[in-house]
Regions:
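N-terminal Rossmann-like FAD-binding beta1-loop-alpha1 element of flavoenzymes
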Residues: 42-69, 211, 218-227
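Rossmann-like NAD(P)H-binding beta-loop-alpha module
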Residues: 203-240
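Conserved acidic residues
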Residues: 50, 151-153, 215
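Residue-level marker of alpha-helix boundaries and capping positions
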Residues: 47, 126-127, 212, 243
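Glycine-rich flavin
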Residues: 2-6, 10, 14-42, 58-65, ...
Length: 243
């Protein structure tokens, strides 16, 4: 596959296609480094405040356990910020555009829809903001969970350290999630490519979107942007949506 310098309106989106294509992050054992200033003991430490980590934290806290939750990024993880919520909000906007486009089939006159990308982004980020309080630091602290918004590292099999805190726990859950697999395609890193972490904040809607990966996420984005008026090309080395 050859690559060329992208035009201002041509974008590449990289999507993981299988679980095996995704890379766990943030929990590799390492040296503790400088001494933290706060020492904690807990029944349970959870690394990662995405769907899995928050569910575990809420359940454990409700059972009366002393829970410490580490998260270096956004509360809510991929699902709230870069996955389920924004993708479904984008799909809902795209469905409205397609409904208007097909109104003539039902005897209803309508002009071809135009897309206000800034308004679409506002709809997407409004959906995130509506759900965010459920996953917020304040809510979990209200449940009795100690939330530490720092990068977590293993000091030993029972101890987690961050910039300010050292926590020893009976049990540790690694719920660090994943990130999009970036395939080793020559020239790809010379392109301003997109992933699920950046596609919902693009300054402009692309005229042409090339999606690498025909899994569920890739095909969701393909349908949404095609319905919103972009030209879309999907590249998949196996079968679209798997076998």
């Amino acid at each position: 596959m050859s690559t060329a310098n992208p035009t201002a309106n041509a974008r590449v989106s990289v999507q993981g296609t299988q679980d095996g294509d995704r890379i766990a992050t943030d929990a590799a054992p390492t040296n503790a480094g400088a001494a933290p200033t706060r020492i904690l003991k807990a029944d349970l430490v959870i690394i990662g405040a995405g769907s899995a980590g928050l569910s575990a934290a809420a359940g454990a806290a409700m059972l009366g356990l002393n829970v410490v939750l580490y998260e270096k990024g956004e509360m809510g993880g991929d699902c709230l910020n870069y996955g389920c919520v924004p993708s479904k909000a984008l799909l809902s906007a795209a469905k409205v555009a397609q409904t208007v486009r097909e109104a003539g089939k039902f005897g209803i006159g309508a002009s071809d829809p135009t897309t206000d990308w800034e308004a679409v982004k506002a709809h997407v980020h409004g959906a995130i903001a509506t759900i965010a309080p459920v996953d917020s630091q304040e809510r979990f602290e209200g449940l009795g969970v100690t939330v530490i918004r720092e990068h977590a590292k293993f000091a030993d099999k029972k101890t987690i350290v961050s910039a300010t805190t050292r926590t020893t726990a009976r049990r540790i859950i690694i719920a660090t999630g994943s990130r999009a697999f970036v395939p080793p395609i020559e020239g790809l890193h010379e392109v301003d490519y997109l992933t699920n972490e950046t596609i919902f904040s693009m300054p402009e809607q692309p005229e042409h979107l090339l999606i690498l990966g025909g899994g569920p996420i890739g095909m969701e984005m393909a349908q949404a942007f095609a319905r919103l008026g972009s030209r879309v090309t999907v590249v998949e080395m196996h079968k679209v949506l798997g076998s």
